[in-house]
């Protein structure tokens, strides 16, 4: 029994091609969501798509350290779909302060 019904929901998962993000993607797909992976490694994305076997999984190559790239891709998706879920899972190396202390450009 699945009490986690996401039928007709659209989710974006950053860093969704592997690790914890990929586990989230699989759970969302199993629960009926349409999922878009945002990741920078096409090799891992292709493997994730192949492993899922789901027609409800798509991807965009997105560098989440680039604000303009995030905005462009988010606007592209939201012009066609209502985004119901956004999981900000991807990690960014090199931050030495609290994330809210950084301007968008960083």
Which residues are covered by each model-predicted region?
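Short, conserved SAM-binding/catalytic segment
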Residues: 48-54
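Structural signature of beta-strand start/N-cap positions in the alpha/beta core
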Residues: 10, 34, 58, 82-84
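Glycine-rich phosphate-binding loop signature in dinucleotide/nucleotide-binding domains
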Residues: 76-82
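Conserved mid-core segment of classical short-chain dehydrogenase/reductases
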Residues: 93-106
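The beta1-alpha1 cofactor-binding region of Rossmann-like NAD(H)/NADP(H)-dependent oxidoreductases
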Residues: 42-43, 60-73, 104
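Conserved glycine-rich Rossmann-like NAD(P)H-binding loop of the short-chain dehydrogenase/reductase
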Residues: 31-47
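Canonical Rossmann dinucleotide-binding motif of NAD(H)/NADP(H)-dependent dehydrogenases/reductases
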Residues: 3-35
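Rossmann-fold scaffold of SDR-type NAD(P)-dependent oxidoreductases
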Residues: 14-15, 83-91
């Amino acid at each position: 029994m699945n009490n986690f019904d996401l039928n007709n929901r659209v989710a974006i998962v950053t860093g969704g091609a592997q690790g914890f993000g990929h586990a989230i993607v699989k759970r969302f797909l199993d629960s009926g969501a349409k999922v878009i992976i945002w990741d920078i490694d096409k090799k891992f994305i292709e493997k994730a798509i192949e492993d899922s076997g789901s027609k409800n999984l798509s991807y965009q190559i997105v560098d989440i350290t680039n604000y303009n790239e995030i905005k462009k891709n988010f606007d592209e998706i939201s012009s066609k779909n209502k985004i119901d879920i956004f999981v900000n899972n991807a990690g960014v190396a090199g931050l030495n302060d609290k994330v809210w202390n950084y301007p968008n450009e960083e």
